[in-house]
Amino acid sequence: MSLERAVRAKIASKRNPEMDKEAQEWIEAIIAEKFPAGQSYEDVLKDGQVLCKLINVLSPNAVPKVNSSGGQFKFMENINNFQKALKEYGVPDIDVFQTVDLYEKKDIANVTNTIFALGRATYKHADFKGPFLGPKPADECKRDFTEEQLKAGQTIVGLQAGSNKGATQAGQNLGAGRKILLGK
């Protein structure tokens, strides 16, 4: 198998149809429109118009001009504008897909992961009341301990690995018992 074919097979194996469906249903719920029947998930997203509608619902006027015609470069501009708006909305840069992942269908799983990252980012916007996608991100819960509390913690046997009962060697026998005979 050629290297290129192996890479394509690996990328295709990352794709989860259930996640694609969940992302599609979430997008449809947010923009209040169904995807056209008979078109695949990636084909609907390819021109970037649906993605721009999505971010404009979540963050009004995030993408002021959505290109509905004009060819490949205008559609790629839609995708780039969507990506820029994602970062401004709070999606980490590491979670944002590359334009070719969608437009050339190189890594649709990465596109779906970006949509899930956007779904997680909606939790951080108190004004968003719509349906959420993905798990709620954890909030930082910083603790401040006094020196006395830290010293007291050093004397306690940690129970992270289970119980500290039976932590002695009493009753442990391995192999035959040893007899020490003196004077023979």
Swiss-Prot record:
Keywords: Muscle protein. The keyword Thylakoid does not apply. Residues 17-122 form the Calponin-homology (CH) domain. GO terms for cellular component: actin cytoskeleton; cytoplasm. Signal peptide: none annotated. The keyword Ubl conjugation does not apply. Gene3D superfamilies: Calponin-like domain. GO terms for molecular function: actin filament binding. Found in synchronous muscle; not found in asynchronous indirect flight muscle. GO terms for biological process: actin filament organization; myoblast fusion; regulation of myoblast fusion. PANTHER family: CALPONIN (PTHR47385), MUSCLE-SPECIFIC PROTEIN 20 (PTHR47385:SF24). This is Muscle-specific protein 20. The lineage of its organism: Eukaryota, Metazoa, Ecdysozoa, Arthropoda, Hexapoda.
